[in-house]
């Protein structure tokens, strides 16, 4: 008789916190297209070396990192303005990432508390979610990058700690489970003492996924029972 495969033991959790870009909505490829176009104009390549640094950051921090890393001959403000103008024209087309809808509806069915914590600022968030307002109405609350309490972007802890304390009742941060696709987001969650499930882009270096509690190729692969949550049923 074959030996049973050991099941990983993770801490049971109650509230769940989700990132948005590249995890719930497929926006990362849209960002890549825009920044590639701008950087190519200056003879620079927007590749995964720089992309992995900016994933999860606030918009101005992203622009600053790209300008400095690639030594672009424009200011961070100029890059931000042009990229935002181009993004506003395409972000409304973003669809769901695999498994996102099913997982959120499963959590809602079982009346589990879950929220969204995204570095996106208000106007950008509204554009991204304009075709999915009913879906995002399922979340207990949403914390955005321009929230007054979010002083420091990821990998700073502000956004996840702010999001956690807005549950009712507020949980101990260690009882939260975060879902992320970016190294910056994973680092922020770990600094908060939270467990974090990472669903990285296939092109992201495996070295940048090692800090995550659990790494999955898709939200379809998430097994809630590993964290003490109700399992999916056929």
Swiss-Prot record:
Identify the keywords attached in UniProt to this record, alphabetized.
Hydrolase, Magnesium, Metal-binding, Nucleotide metabolism
Q: Which cofactor does it need?
A: Mg(2+)
Active site per database record: 19, 21
This entry's Gene Ontology molecular function terms read: metal ion binding; pseudouridine 5'-phosphatase activity
Q: Which InterPro entries match?
A: Gpp1/Gpp2-like, HAD-like_sf, HAD-SF_hydro_IA, HAD_2, HAD_sf, PGP-like_dom2
GO BP terms, alphabetized: nucleotide metabolic process
The catalysed reaction is: psi-UMP + H2O = pseudouridine + phosphate
Q: Which residues bind Mg(2+)?
A: 19, 21
Q: Which Pfam families match?
A: HAD_2
* Enzyme's top EC category: hydrolase
SUPFAM superfamilies of this UniProt entry? HAD-like (SSF56784)
**EC identifiers of the protein:** 3.1.3.96
The family line of this record is: Belongs to the HAD-like hydrolase superfamily. CbbY/CbbZ/Gph/YieH family.
Which NCBIfam families has this protein been placed in? HAD-SF-IA-v3 (TIGR01509)
The record's function comment reads: Dephosphorylates pseudouridine 5'-phosphate, a potential intermediate in rRNA degradation. Pseudouridine is then excreted intact in urine.
Protein name in UniProt: Pseudouridine-5'-phosphatase
Q: Which organism is it from?
A: Mus musculus
